[in-house]
Amino acid sequence: MLSDVVQSQGLVLGFDTSAAHCAAALLSGTNIIAHHADNMARGQGEHLMGLLQDLLDGAGHGWCDLTALGVGIGPGNFTGIRISVSAARGLALSLGIPAIGVSSFEATALAHIGPFTTSVPAPREQLYTQLFSAEGPQAPRLVSACEIDKRIPHIPCSAPLELAGQIAQIAAKRAGTPQPRPAPLYIKAADAAPSRDPAPTLLA
């Protein structure tokens, strides 16, 4: 009976390690039924799978109950993003379910109506930003804080727990249509594009 409910509603696991945290959320239908986040500057690679397992166990579910995965693709910490993207690709392959990449910008923008600018902290006191307007999102940029247009509302990146839930919600909405494999979002000063690197090594 539980499996029938899961299949009808969809069970989506969203997770993110794009900054100094390891965060995950479990979405059943439209409800977040479990979530957890640990602040950590390093060690996400060793910590992530255990966190995901504990989250599923605590909610009374197993890996085979999942219908989709949502993974944060950044921007942010290079190593952290590759850890979660690699995990999502490996899990999607082994479970036979889609893995959907969601940027921190998209996740943060989920509950807001434009125009507004979302931002993620970047090195050297800079910010990764993306403008959302009625015409749609513009290309992400790397800017200094003084370059942000103060005439437009500015929304900092969501806190880790909220971010993981937003990633799961967006992944659930996209799960019914073909999606590209998740890839890290790297942003340079005048350029923004998903990584074209070879796929990271899949985690067992």
Task: Describe the role of every protein-language-model region.
Residues 59-64, 92-102:
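Phosphate-handling active-site elements
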Residues 68-98:
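DPxDG-like acidic metal-binding loop motif
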